[in-house]
């Protein structure tokens, strides 16, 4: 009998929220099995990344270039797969204003949208996160806090 050793995959994603419009940044994926779906900035943690958030900072730089100052970072959720080998940290990144991202080859478009009008089709994991009742409540409370 062969023994299989699974390596844990740790990844992070960031949902930019612009305070001035209360809209979120979505990116149109260009590659792989999720090409043609709308997602958020993010990706896998690499060996050089010391934390899941450090991985997100690197992914932000790679995928959307220079961004406005992130005023606050709020953890939204930690998704764990059923087999407990995939962990996805999702953060809300609050910025003052919307910006025009400098997209790399992983994405072919972007859209700033409110949470009642998502771009379609939405990446399955992002959709699961945004339709989760607990996460929706957290986001609504966040809107109350930022005004």
Language model: regions and residue ranges:
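Conserved N-terminal beta-strand and adjoining loop/helix that marks the start
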Residues: 1-25
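Catalytic phosphate/metal-binding cores of nucleic-acid and nucleotide-processing enzymes, i.e., regions
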Residues: 4-5, 18, 37, 55, ...
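Active-site-adjacent beta-strand/loop module that shapes the phosphate/pyrophosphate-binding cleft
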Residues: 9-10, 20-22, 77-117, 133, ...
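Short strand-loop junctions, especially beta-strand C-caps/beta-turns
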Residues: 43, 115-116, 121
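Active-site micro-motifs of SAM-dependent methyltransferase domains
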Residues: 62, 109, 120
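Active-site or metal-binding loop neighborhoods of secreted/extracellular toxin and effector enzymes
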Residues: 123-143
């Amino acid at each position: 009998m062969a023994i299989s050793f699974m390596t844990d995959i740790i990844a992070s994603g960031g949902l930019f929220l612009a305070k001035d419009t209360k809209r979120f940044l979505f990116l149109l994926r260009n590659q792989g099995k999720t090409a043609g779906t709308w997602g958020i900035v993010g990706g896998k943690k690499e060996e050089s990344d010391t934390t899941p958030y450090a991985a997100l900072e690197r992914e932000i730089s790679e995928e959307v270039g220079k961004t406005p100052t992130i005023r606050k970072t709020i953890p939204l959720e930690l998704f764990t797969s059923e087999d407990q080998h995939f962990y996805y940290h999702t953060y809300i990144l609050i910025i003052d204003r919307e910006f025009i991202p400098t997209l790399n080859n992983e994405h072919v478009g972007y859209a700033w949208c409110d949470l009642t009008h998502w771009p379609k089709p939405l990446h399955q994991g992002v959709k699961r996160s945004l339709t989760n009742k607990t996460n929706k409540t957290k986001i609504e409370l966040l809107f109350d806090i930022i005004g």
